[in-house]
Amino acid sequence: MIRVLLADDQQLIREALAALLGLEVDLQIVGQVGSGDEVLGAVALLKPDVVLLDVQMPGTLLADGIEAAAALRDAGAVSESGEPVRTLIVTTFGRPGYVRRALEAGASGFVVKDTGARQLAEAIRRVHAGLRVV
């Protein structure tokens, strides 16, 4: 079972992602947060395998999902199984500059929000397996 934390400032998006991904037999949504500042604490508490991060989220310590990915990498965050926590950026902004920043911050993948549910689930599986998704 792949343990997933959702981080998006829009509650409707978080709940829709949780509902869709919850239909996958090998994915478990372990938590949801609405700001970059909540990500580190939630990861420390819930120890997910993969964190889905929106790029633009409110926060004072962590200004966006890309900064949250870098903070998780720098903190050496680990999952319940002891493996490094992987991050997947999920955003409406598919511009090359965002992709480059995300990968430089240690994100394992980058997908746009108009990706289908099956493709997103597969991206989570690939990121969990240590592969890069762009």
Regions found by a protein language model. Give the residues of each.
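Acidic, metal-coordinating helix/loop segments flanking the phosphotransfer/catalytic sites
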Residues: 32-50
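Short amphipathic alpha-helix used as the core "switch/output" element in two-component signaling
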Residues: 41, 63-83
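Active-site residues of response regulator receiver
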Residues: 54-55, 91
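C-terminal output helix
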Residues: 97, 115-128, 132
